[in-house]
From Swiss-Prot:
It is found in: Secreted. The keyword Secreted applies. One of its GO terms (cellular component) is extracellular region. The cysteine framework is C-C-C-C-C-C-C-C-C. Expressed by the venom duct. One of its GO terms (molecular function) is toxin activity. It comes from Californiconus californicus (California cone). This is Conotoxin Cal8.2. Contains 4 disulfide bonds. Keywords: Disulfide bond, Ion channel impairing toxin, Neurotoxin, Secreted, Signal, Toxin.
Length: 131
């Protein structure tokens, strides 16, 4: 399983997304309504779930690597869920006071939008893996 995980993560450059699927029962979905128009979802670890980290790359609109971010997810199930879903929930906290809830994905690009003062959300749309 570890070898498969390594191959899946190493063979493709992953961009990040946000989705309403929280992956294999280890997370609970939370719905967030933004500007009374759009509904977004993020996922949070259930109490007692161990958080683990993984580094993934963000792509720009030209499908080029923009930067790397460290995603924190709940156990191994989060990453394996990404490869079948293809979404999996993750929490990223770059500032220490604004948690950011993402889902990593394969074969998708991302767009960024501001949800509220607590976190930034990133949503996926169909695209190619960036080089």
């Amino acid at each position: 399983m570890k070898l498969l995980l390594t191959l899946l993560l190493g063979s493709a450059l992953m961009c990040i997304t946000l989705a309403d699927e929280c992956g294999l029962g280890t997370h609970r979905p939370v719905k967030e309504v933004i500007d009374n128009v759009r509904t977004m979802y993020y996922c949070d670890c259930r109490a007692g779930d161990a958080e683990r980290s993984i580094t993934v790359s963000r792509c720009d609109d030209n499908n080029q690597k923009q930067d790397d971010v460290i995603l924190t997810y709940c156990g191994l199930e989060q990453t394996t869920g990404c490869n079948t879903n293809p979404y999996t929930a993750a929490k990223h906290d770059s500032s220490g006071d604004k948690p950011q809830f993402y889902c990593s994905c394969l074969n998708y690009k991302y767009e960024q939008s501001h949800a509220d003062s607590r976190y930034w959300t990133i949503r996926c749309y169909m695209g190619d893996i960036c080089d």
